[in-house]
Amino acid sequence: MAKAKFERNKPHCNIGTIGHVDHGKTSLTAAITKVLAETSGGATFTAYDQIDKAPEEKARGITISTAHVEYETQNRHYAHVDCPGHADYVKNMITGAAQMDGAILVVSAADGPMPQTREHILLARQVGVPALVVFLNKCDMVDDPELLELVELEVRELLSKYDFPGDDIPIVRGSALCALENKSPELGAEAILKLMAEVDKYIPQPERPVDQPFLMPIEDVFSISGRGTVVTGRVERGIVKVGDEVEIVGIRPTVKTTVTGIEMFRKLLDQGQAGDNVGVLLRGTKREDVERGQVVCKPGSVKPHTKFKAEAYILTKEEGGRHTPFFTNYRPQFYFRTTDVTGVVTLPEGTEMVMPGDNISVDVQLIVPIAMEEKLRFAIREGGRTVGAGVVASIIE
């Protein structure tokens, strides 16, 4: 049967399932597709084993296994990611390979919160996942309502500990297995529909890139005789129009200038928008005043910084990373958007070294400022070879 084409007339949202191994993330993903396929036709049922053998993808030089399913509710169209292994989650969330606008935290009612439950909540906080909804799975295995209350309380405390609004986050009780096997509808299909209603309501609709303030990383600089300097790149977000005042940020002191022309495929345009590869002509800017690695942006929308806290994943030897651990004062290059900048890594108190395969929170001090904000992704490199990936968790200065 041919794949039905999804009508893109509903707002789009990216979500994923997170939580401890074997708590039922993949079963829940399968159950959502099954229930929506049967009730509203908003999905194609994708069985557990189809999701579980997820294809490998490369993101920022790192191989990650991720399964993607899509479905829609009355209100929204969703792209949903599910990862087979814990390491895949860590890599996925840190590289932003699958951007999450929100996530469903799956907790087994029979086991309660476990180490990876905690770790995924912390990661979600560090990489800036805006909102979580909880699915308390395997409720068919728990007869004692007081035990369910207790697990729910534990989950709320854990969420609050990592700065999520634990008291307000919706928690839906159910059983993905019941939904897949058409048993006890109140724990099965009905619980799944209730969960999706909460996801619709509680996870905020993300702002589209085109509605955000203009930013374009500079990839190349040319001078065109008699016309001035052209910077080229792919517009990351927002819209730029001829006549707009912009700032050039990063590496050097910030300068203001005006856009006097925009071209794409050798044609002149009135504006460029998120996703376009364009050349932007800048008034009165000399070729030697701008360089790859800077950004052109809406004035005041992004500032240059040198010091930040990051959440990073360090590649294993098998993934092409380092063969040995590193220590505090490690000096690799940090690849932001289009360029490498050297930086010094400070490990947290009590951490002696970082092994390949670890994920860790570190402080980084760059030797030159880069236009940055929270959630910005980067690669960690040594001589052009990727040895890790990271995300800016917070800016220090």
Swiss-Prot record:
Domain tr-type G: 10-207
Sequence intervals crossing the membrane: none
A Pfam family: GTP_EFTU
InterPro entries: EF-Tu_GTP-bd, EF-Tu_GTPase, EFTu-like_2, EFTU_2, G_TR_CS, P-loop_NTPase, Small_GTP-bd, T_Tr_GTP-bd_dom
Annotated spans, G3: 82-85
Compartment list: Cytoplasm
EC primary class: hydrolase
Positions of Mg(2+) binding: 26
Location of region: G1: 19-26
Segments of this protein annotated with the region G2: 61-65
Region (G4): 137-140
GO cellular component term of the entry, any: cytosol
Keywords: Cytoplasm, Elongation factor, GTP-binding, Hydrolase, Magnesium, Metal-binding, Nucleotide-binding, Protein biosynthesis
Domain of life: Bacteria
Region (G5): 175-177
Enzyme Commission designation: 3.6.5.3
Catalytic reaction list: GTP + H2O = GDP + phosphate + H(+)
NCBIfam families: EF-Tu, PRK00049.1, PRK12735.1, PRK12736.1, small_GTP
Annotated function: GTP hydrolase that promotes the GTP-dependent binding of aminoacyl-tRNA to the A-site of ribosomes during protein biosynthesis.
Protein name: Elongation factor Tu
